[in-house]
Amino acid sequence: MDPSIFKLLEEDEDESMHSGADVDAFQAALNRDIEGSMTTSIPHVTNPGNNHSSRQQFSTWKNGIGDSNINVQTQHSLESTQMKEQEGSTLENQHQHDLKRANEPHLQHNQPQDLHRAGQLWENPSQVPQSTGLPISEKNPTGNESDRSHNQESESQYMKLQKMSSQQARGVEPPVNPMNVNPINRNPKQVPFAALLPTLMNQLDKDRALQLRTLYARLKKNEIPKEGFTRHMKDIVGDQMLRMAVSKLQQVNYNQGKIGIQAPSTEINNQKSQSDPRAVHLNQLPSSASGTLGSSVPVQGLTKHPQHQMQHPPSSFPMYTTSGSFHSFPGPNTNASGSTLRPHLHDSHMRHVAHNQPMGSTGLGGPPQSTTNMMTMPKFERPSSVNDPSRVQGGATSHFQNSSSLPLNSAPGQGSSVSHVKQESVDQSFEKNNAASMTSNEDLEKESSRMVLSTPNNMAPASSVSPSMTTQLDASTTMNSRGPLGTSQGGANARMPPKKPSVGQKKPLETLGSSPPPPSKKQKVAGNSMDQSIEQLNDVTAVSGVNLREEEEQLFSGAKEDGRVSEASRRVVHEEEERLILQKNPLQRKLAEIMAKAGLKQISNDVERCLSLCVEERMRGLLSHIIRLSKQRVDAEKSRHRTFITSDIRLQINEMNQKVKEEWEKKQAEAEKLKKPSESEEGDGGVDSEKDKEDNRSKGVKGNKEDDDKMRTTAANVAARAAVGGDDAFLKWQLMAEARQKSVSEAGKDGNQKTTSGGGKNSKDRQDGGRRFSGTESSCGVGIVYRVSSSRFWFAMMSFGFLFAGGRRVGKNQGSSLQPKVVRTISVKDVVAVLEREPQMSKSTLMYRLIQ
């Protein structure tokens, strides 16, 4: 890495920490020392002519409290450091300035020499400090008698003003001002890491900014050396961006160093601004560059939370002006609790004639300059009530008066002005209720580091200076003169339009030395803006063709119609509510009885309606449960549970068997009757009887075969019909019985004929054949009832099985079709079943009455 960049990034850091108890103890001791030193040393400085004694008193007092100043600075630096770490990397610049304050003890001992040499820093830019603050005590072996005499006079004026400031400040409050000293670098070319870090953060994305912030935290904890931090930062940021940021900071610090030389305050306050945030401090500082007075009234005006009050030195917004420069330094914001503090400065103590010195004639080459010394105050106005004039006024308290004009450095058209400074009485009262969120600490910090109003090369006359105070001014921004250079006229009043550093609000112009504006001005402006916005809105509606009156009428008419509809619906609901399930008179009588028993005197009208609705809801629930349980109840007396008989197979079989038996008995009786006459005729023809027997046998066999075939065919047809779903089984059995009767009658006829022609043996054979036929007949007709050892039994079983199955199916279908729909009824059994399942009714007397 380039060694020049490395040198630019070097800085000295003080990481020393102190506990809170040590700081408080030191604070108390410091307060006692300050009170004693101020009472003993300051009253002696009363004679402006006694330069030697005042010089000794000043140096003695400065040396006595020098160490205390350093400790106070360290204390506030530590407080600022803690708050900076919470706020983030954007406030690192101020944090580093506060830390380096303890490293410059030698700047606070040789104060008169520094004040004397502050005017020479304009001619030597290499000795200009890099940050606005205390002048650097550079070693300068050369000097002249005029400078010394000027130094003595400025010292006497300085001590005189200190005495006056201390007397008035004690009436207000012991101020806290730990030496308004900004940290400076030992080498003007060096750039601190803390000042460089916010500039780089704004140009990086989130990831790289986070990496850089983490790297800086490690550097603060001494985890990595400065060389390693520089190397890693170059890797993250890049060489080109780093060079640009460093050059920009150098330019900014150079400009601020040229115009920001100021004398430190010599008062050390006995209380911190944290303990009493309602203080108004008066610090009057000499301007040593031109010999004129630059007085500042620090205003602590903007209320912040206590944790935000450690970020700045206790003196807030003093503006120190030397060689025509304007510089502001922010401090913690406090709130004066409604009290108006008015430090009145006498005019005789504030009027001094500036010593004009031809700086170009001393041989120190430099640009021609026109110095204008001003006493200004930043102006921060808070919103207040209409009749409340309690607002902080500042900024317009400088009155410029030129008593002479001398050319500087033999440059025509340029001159120096003699300033006459008069500080007007300023009302500094704040309302705590009106001090909410006006500015942020970032705004105040930016204002302290970026508010530059003019440069030595381009100076305007006092009458043409019009700086603007905003929080967005860059550090390198300067105010160029708007008119030609020239000498200012005596008694000319410079107009300064300071603006409030709050975002989005502007302040009206004010003339220096004028009285504060009326408090109702802002409200008037706000009212005018509101009226203007309403008028603009009306204009927009008119241009767009919207008639507001018609729209309003439509809206109101729609509301009326809605009201009518809602009224009708309310009326209907009311009528429905009036139709209660319980009658009013019986209900009122019952309620009266209950009230008499319970000892009630009065009952509301809504009770009747509520009871009626409750009864209705209870009955609805009971009925739904009763209907559900009635479907599950099974009663024998119900008609829907009765069975309808469509066909009785057993009865039909018994009837058929009975008929067969009767027929068989008749045949037997007829056969016996015929047997008796045949026995008498047996002896007549033996050969004929044998032939007849054989013929009868052959005919009987043939007849039986035919009958069997017929029966098989009919049974098969009946079974097929039953399988398909044909006629009733009763008809089928009837057909089969008729067929059997026919076959039996035919067989009987044939047998009778044979018996009449045949002998006694033929009659026995016919009897056997009749028995055999009757047996087969009964087996075919009865089936399951009679078991016959025959090959046709299994076929009959199969056929009858089909018949039985078909009969069952037909019977079921007929039963379902003939079954009527039963009308459901609710009986006491259903009510009892429902109440038994309810816990609150299962053991009530109503259950016993229902069961009985």
Swiss-Prot record:
Residues 41-100, 124-166, 284-315, 354-528, 662-712, 742-777 are annotated as: Disordered. Residues 662-679, 688-712, 742-752, 762-771 have a biased composition (Basic and acidic residues). Expressed in roots, leaves and inflorescences. The keyword Cell membrane does not apply. InterPro entries: Histone-fold, RST, TAF4, TAF4_C. GO terms for molecular function: protein heterodimerization activity. One of its GO terms (biological process) is DNA-templated transcription initiation. One of its GO terms (cellular component) is transcription factor TFIID complex. TAFs are components of the transcription factor IID (TFIID) complex that is essential for mediating regulation of RNA polymerase transcription. Component of the TFIID complex. TFIID is composed of TATA binding protein (TBP) and a number of TBP-associated factors (TAFs) whose MWs range from 14-217 kDa. Can homodimerize. Interacts with TAF5, TAF8, TAF9, TAF10, TAF12, TAF12B, TAF13 TAF14, TAF14B, TAF15 and TAF15B. This is Transcription initiation factor TFIID subunit 4b. It comes from Arabidopsis thaliana (Mouse-ear cress). The gene is TAF4B.
